[in-house]
Amino acid sequence: MDVADSTSETPPVFDHDNLALAAQTNLLQFYLTHLASTLVPPMKLDMRDSMTPSFSQTESPNSETDDSTSAANKVLFSILGTPTTDSTSNAVSKSSSKLCSVCGDKSTGLHYGAATCEGCKGFFKRSVQNKKVYHCSQDNCCEIDKQNRNRCQSCRFRKCISKGMLTEAVREDRMPGGRNGNSIYSNYKQRRSIIRKTKDYVEEQERRPFQSLPSGKKLIKELVEMDCLDRLINLKGLRINPSANCDIAPACKRLTRIGDEIVEQLVEWTKTLPFFDELPVEAHTHLLTQRWAELVLLSAGYYACSVFTPDSPDTTEMIDETDEISFTNPQVNLRLLQNRLSLVLGKEIPLEHVAKEAGPLVTRFTTLLHSFSNLKVSPEAYVCIKAITLLHLSADSTLDRSIIDKVNTLQDHFVKTLQIHLHQPGEDAQTTSLAQILDWLPDLRNASSVLLHSKMFYVPFLLCKNPRRLVFDE
């Protein structure tokens, strides 16, 4: 039956029953497994490849497996290189999670730029918000641990700063006096400058890992040069159906497999990152599995903001023939999605079907676009945010503790690199603060869950890129 002749039946493009593993919580496993039949044999990346196990590259995505994560890991191992250790043997219990970098208590995550417990997080936040200035009676040499962390506030705050906690990351609008308060308390800025000149800090910097990583502008330049945004936006699965009356099935098949193409592009991008060789392959696998949906939305959002001009917040009228995505009106974007989806499929897709299946995703993506456009992110800030997003570990990560430490250290490095960039003077100086960007990241995370639930991974790209203007290197 012609899709245009009926609004009661669900168009094939919205029928996801043919995805054998679509019911799994993490759809990435399906796509990674399917990639095994389409990718070339493992690339020789370095000396570790001499130990490469023989992985099958013909596994069917419909075959049952006792461990879908293991199957997915095999595919990523074949793309990224050889794991240095068995990821299973490196798994640790939740009870052995990372410790607070300030007092050694159990860490609850990354707070203001450092992995800390709730106690040190709250102490740091209150100190900055209340503009406290502490003094030590013991020459600033008090030991700070779980038992005596409350004995000397001065040394505790000093250690917070030395471990990378950022006063700039504390919300300005929660400061006494609201947003009119100073974003960086001058006393803290002065004290931080003094601390960084101390012998202890210099020795700590000399001992820090990842000495091979470039720093500052050089690191950002490498990230900009290696970014795969053009390839990620110009997805082959979004080609226009050449005939207006041809079978809709092949186009639907391309769209349902577009996750393959997305993951492959993200894997290739990961291999170009300056810190690729600093982490074992199982860490890259774990990070991509957790964060690929966020990277999709971030990339599509930045592309839209760099190509289109955000519309007025007062825009409420439906624009029937618009060729631009709206940053404020989900209804405009639903109509845009309907037009472009019909163009790709060669069949008219009823608007009510698009609204029913993609409405929540389009609404959330529009909201995300609006908030992201307000940040006015530069290309340099975008690539830093992208690296920070990839390196964000969940609290229940099962990676080996030593790997978790490395990932957190790397993320800290990119947070500080972003901070330095945001404070660069000049004509192109950023008006956005680090705190504003950190506040936006949870919105990105929440939107990614809607994308995963919808299974329509092509929607952000189809909204941001007119399929008539796709460019391929062939």
Curated annotation (Swiss-Prot):
CDD domains: NR_DBD_DHR4_like, NR_LBD_DHR4_like. GO terms for molecular function: nuclear receptor activity; RNA polymerase II cis-regulatory region sequence-specific DNA binding; zinc ion binding. Residues 51-69 have a biased composition (Polar residues). SUPFAM superfamilies: Glucocorticoid receptor-like (DNA-binding domain), Nuclear receptor ligand-binding domain. Residues 50-69 are annotated as: Disordered. GO terms for cellular component: nucleus. Keywords: DNA-binding, Metal-binding, Nucleus, Receptor, Transcription, Transcription regulation, Zinc, Zinc-finger. Gene3D superfamilies: Erythroid Transcription Factor GATA-1, subunit A (3.30.50.10), Retinoid X Receptor (1.10.565.10). It holds the Pfam family Hormone_recep. A zinc finger (NR C4-type) spans 100-120, 136-155. Residues 97-172 bind DNA. One of its GO terms (biological process) is cell differentiation. It is found in: Nucleus. Residues 215-474 form the NR LBD domain. Orphan nuclear receptor. This is Nuclear hormone receptor family member nhr-91. It comes from Caenorhabditis elegans.
